[in-house]
C-alpha cells in the first residue's frame, strides 16, 4: 500500500470525478483466497525449475557440491530481491485505486504525466509492450505447468511417458471448455487446495534438509558469487533457468485488485515464501545426496508410495495456476479494450456475485489454440522451459521502469534511492533478461512472436481509431451548429425518449443527423450520452454522472457524461438510471427509450491517400472493426429497442 504522503501525491494527479474505493483490510479469509488466485504460477514452479537448470545445454550445470550450492543461492536471492523487495514491499504500494498490473500502472503514470505528452506516450508504449509480453507468457504457463505435473507419473512408472502428452491435452482441453460456465463453485476450493499444496512442499523438503543440513548455508550470497566467479559461463546460462522460480512474481501485483495487497503480503510471508524456500532447499539437499536424481528432482523427493497422490495434487495445483493465467488474460483484455487498445470484446459475466469473473470467447479459444500448439511442438516440459522466461523478464524490466517514474514524480524519491533501486533490482533483472536472450533460438522466439502480434494489434487499433475519430468529427460537424439549425427549421416533434450513445459533446451523433435526414422528426426528449473511461479502475456511482442541458430549455436535448473506470461495466441503461437523480423527468421515460447507435463502416481509401498507415495495417484495422463485439451487448442495450444508423468512413 502507499503511505499517506505518497497517496496524497498520487491523489493530486487524480481527476476530481474519481474517488478511491476503501482499501481492503488484512483478513485471513482473503489471504486464503489469495493462495488460489495469486500464487498458482510461482507455487508450481518447483515442479520444473531445478530439473531445467540441470538439463540445459546438455547438462552443463553439474550436480556437484559447488554447482548445487550456487544454484540454490541464486534462487534464494532472486526470490528475495525480485519478489520480496521489488514486488511485495515496493511495487504493490503503487496501486491504481486498489488495482495492480502493468496496464493499471501505465494508466496511473499517464495520469501523473498528463502535462508531459512525451513521457505519457512513452508510458503508453511501455504498457502496450508489457501487455504483449504478458500474453506471450500466457500461452506457455498452462502448457508447462500441467505437463510438468503429469510427468511425475514417469517417476513411478517409466512406461507412463507415452500418456503424458495425451493426458495433458485432455486436461487443458477440459479446462478451456469449462471457462464459459465460470469457476464460481469450484473456485471456492482453490484456496484450500493451494494451502494443502504449499504445506506439502514444506513436508517434502524438511526430511531432506535434516538429512543434509549443510544445504542451509546456500542461503549465503557468497555461494552465488563464488559460482559466478568460478564458472561464469555456466552461471550465466543457469540464470536462464533460475528465472523459472520467479515467473509468477508479476501475478502478485496484477491480481492485487482481487484480494488486496495486505492479504497477499500475509499469505506470501506467512506461508508461501517459507514453503517454497524449504522445498528448494530440500531439492538441493536431495541432489547432494543423490546426484543421479536430477531427471525429476521434485517427484524424487517423495517416497514411492506417495508418488501418485503427489501427482494428483500437483495436477490440481497446476490447473489452478493455469486458471489464474486464463482469468488474468480475460481481465487484461477487458481493461485493454476499455482503454482503447483493443476492439470491443464480447465480455460475458459468469458470476452474479463476483463482477470480476468474466469470460471472453475470442481470448479463450486463441489461448487454447496457442497452448495446444506449444504442447504438440515441444512435447515435454523441459523442452518447453527453453521457451519460457524471456517475455516475463521483459515485463519485469518494463514494470521497474514505470515504477521508477512513479516513485520519482509522485513519491519524490531522492535520486540516490532511484539509482540504488534501479541498480540493485534492475541489475538483477537485466542479468536474468540477458541470460534468457540465449533462449531465442531454442524457442524463446515464440512468446516474443505472440507479444509482437499483440503489440501490432494494439498500436494499429489505437492509431486507426484516432484517425477515424478525426474523420468522424469532420462528418458530424459541431453540435452547436446543429442546435442553431434546429432552432431555425423547428423539426416535427414526436413523443418519447431517444438516446444517442456518442463519444463526446463537441459533435453531433451521426444517428441523430440521419434520424432527422431520413425520418424528418425529433423526439420530445433527446439524450446524448458518452461513456468516459478514466485512467482509474473504478469510479463510484455517486461520482459517475455529469449532466449538461444543451441549447434552450425547450429544446429537449440533454448531454450526459458517465465516467467509469477501466474495469467498470459500460452499461448505458444503468447510467441513465443513475442520471435520473439529476433529471427527474427521466424516470417516466426509461422503459420506453429508443437507443440510436451511430455505425461507422470503415472502408479502405485509395493507396495514394493513405500515407498515415500502411496498407496491411489498414486491412487489419478494418477486419477488427467489422468483427468487434456488438455495441448493444457492450452497452447492455435491449436489442428490441436499438436502432443502428450511420455511414461509411474512409481509412
Swiss-Prot record:
| Keyword annotations from UniProtKB, A to Z | Cell membrane, Ion transport, Membrane, Potassium, Potassium transport, Symport, Transmembrane, Transmembrane helix, Transport
Xref: InterPro entries: K+_transporter, K_trans_C, K_trans_N, Kup
According to its UniProt record, where is this protein mainly located?
A: membrane
> What is any Pfam family matched here?
K_trans
| Entry GO MF terms | potassium ion transmembrane transporter activity; symporter activity
How is the protein disposed in the membrane?
Multi-pass membrane protein
Annotated catalysed reactions: K(+)(in) + H(+)(in) = K(+)(out) + H(+)(out)
**Bilayer-crossing regions:** 30-50, 71-91, 124-144, 158-178, 190-210, 233-253, 268-288, 310-330, 358-378, 387-407, 413-433, 437-457
Which cellular compartments is it found in? Cell membrane
Q: Which GO terms describe its cellular component?
A: plasma membrane
Family in the record: Belongs to the HAK/KUP transporter (TC 2.A.72) family.
Biological role: Transport of potassium into the cell. Likely operates as a K(+):H(+) symporter.
Report the protein name in the record: Probable potassium transport system protein Kup
Amino acid at each position: 500500500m502507499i503511505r499517506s504522503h505518497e497517496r496524497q501525491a498520487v491523489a493530486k494527479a487524480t481527476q476530481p470525478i474519481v474517488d478511491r474505493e476503501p482499501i481492503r483490510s488484512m483478513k485471513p479469509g482473503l489471504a486464503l483466497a489469495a493462495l488460489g488466485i495469486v500464487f498458482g504460477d510461482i507455487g508450481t514452479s518447483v515442479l520444473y525449475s531445478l530439473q531445467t537448470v540441470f538439463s540445459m545445454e546438455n547438462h552443463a550445470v553439474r550436480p556437484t557440491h559447488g554447482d548445487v550450492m550456487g544454484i540454490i543461492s541464486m534462487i534464494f536471492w532472486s526470490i528475495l530481491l525480485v519478489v520480496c523487495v521489488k514486488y511485495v514491499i515496493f511495487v504493490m504500494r503503487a496501486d491504481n485505486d486498489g488495482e495492480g498490473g502493468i496496464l493499471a500502472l501505465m494508466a496511473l503514470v499517464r495520469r501523473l504525466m498528463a502535462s508531459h505528452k512525451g513521457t505519457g506516450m512513452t508510458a503508453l508504449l511501455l504498457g502496450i509492450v508489457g501487455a504483449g509480453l504478458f500474453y506471450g507468457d500466457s500461452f506457455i504457463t498452462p502448457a508447462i505447468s500441467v505437463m510438468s505435473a503429469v510427468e511425475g507419473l514417469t517417476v513411478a512408472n517409466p512406461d507412463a511417458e507415452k500418456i503424458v502428452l495425451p493426458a495433458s491435452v485432455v486436461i487443458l482441453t477440459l479446462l478451456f471448455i469449462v471457462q464459459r460456465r465460470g469457476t464460481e463453485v469450484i473456485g471456492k476450493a482453490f484456496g484450500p487446495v493451494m494451502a494443502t499444496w504449499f504445506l506439502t512442499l514444506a513436508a517434502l523438503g524438511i526430511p531432506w534438509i535434516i538429512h543434509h543440513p549443510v544445504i542451509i548455508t546456500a542461503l549465503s550470497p557468497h555461494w552465488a558469487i563464488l559460482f559466478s566467479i568460478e564458472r561464469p559461463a555456466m552461471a550465466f546460462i543457469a540464470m536462464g533457468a533460475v528465472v523459472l522460480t520467479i515467473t509468477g512474481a508479476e501475478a502478485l501485483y496484477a491480481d492485487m485488485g482481487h484480494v488486496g495487497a495486505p492479504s497477499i503480503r500475509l499469505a506470501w510471508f506467512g506461508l508461501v515464501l517459507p514453503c517454497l524456500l524449504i522445498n528448494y532447499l530440500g531439492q538441493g539437499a536431495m541432489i547432494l545426496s543423490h546426484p543421479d536424481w536430477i531427471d525429476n528432482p521434485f517427484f524424487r523427493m517423495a517416497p514411492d508410495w506417495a508418488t501418485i497422490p503427489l501427482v494428483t495434487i500437483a495436477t490440481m495445483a497446476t490447473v489452478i495456476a493455469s486458471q489464474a493465467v486464463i482469468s488474468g488474460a480475460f481481465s487484461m483484455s477487458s481493461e485493454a479494450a476499455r482503454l482503447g487498445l483493443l476492439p470491443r470484446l464480447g465480455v460475458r459475466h459468469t458470476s452474479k456475485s463476483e463482477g470480476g469473473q468474466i469470460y471472453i470467447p475470442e481470448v479463450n479459444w486463441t489461448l487454447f489454440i496457442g497452448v495446444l500448439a506449444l504442447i504438440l511442438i515441444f512435447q515435454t516440459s523441459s523442452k518447453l522451459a527453453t521457451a519460457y522466461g524471456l517475455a516475463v523478464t521483459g515485463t519485469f524490466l518494463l514494470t521497474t521502469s514505470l515504477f521508477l517514474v512513479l516513485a520519482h514524480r509522485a513519491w519524490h524519491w531522492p535520486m540516490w534511492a532511484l539509482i540504488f533501486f534501479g541498480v540493485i533490482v534492475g541489475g538483477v533483472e537485466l542479468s536474468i533478461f540477458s541470460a534468457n536472450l540465449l533462449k531465442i533460438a531454442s524457442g524463446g522466439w515464440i512468446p516474443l512472436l505472440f507479444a509482437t502480434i499483440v503489440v501490432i494489434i494494439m498500436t494499429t487499433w489505437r492509431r486507426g481509431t484516432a484517425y477515424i475519430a478525426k474523420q468522424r468529427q469532420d462528418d458530424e460537424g459541431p453540435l452547436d451548429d446543429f442546435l442553431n439549425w434546429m432552432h431555425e427549421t423547428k423539426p416535427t416533434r414526436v413523443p418519447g425518449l431517444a438516446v444517442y450513445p456518442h463519444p463526446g459533446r463537441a459533435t453531433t451523433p451521426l444517428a441523430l443527423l440521419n434520424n432527422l435526414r431520413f425520418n424528418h422528426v425529433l423526439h420530445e426528449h433527446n439524450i446524448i450520452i458518452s461513456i468516459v473511461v478514466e485512467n482509474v479502475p473504478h469510479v463510484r456511482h455517486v461520482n459517475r454522472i455529469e449532466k449538461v442541458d444543451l441549447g434552450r430549455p425547450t429544446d429537449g436535448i440533454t448531454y450526459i457524461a458517465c465516467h467509469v473506470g477501466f474495469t467498470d461495466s459500460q452499461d448505458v441503461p444503468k447510467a441513465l438510471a443513475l442520471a435520473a437523480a439529476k433529471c427527474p423527468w427521466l424516470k417516466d421515460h426509461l422503459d420506453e427509450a429508443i437507443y440510436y447507435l451511430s455505425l461507422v463502416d470503415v472502408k479502405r481509401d485509395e493507396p495514394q491517400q493513405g500515407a498515415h498507415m500502411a496498407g496491411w495495417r489498414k486491412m487489419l484495422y478494418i477486419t477488427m472493426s467489422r468483427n468487434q463485439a456488438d455495441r448493444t451487448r457492450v452497452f447492455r442495450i435491449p436489442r428490441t429497442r436499438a436502432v443502428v444508423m450511420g455511414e461509411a468512413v474512409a481509412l
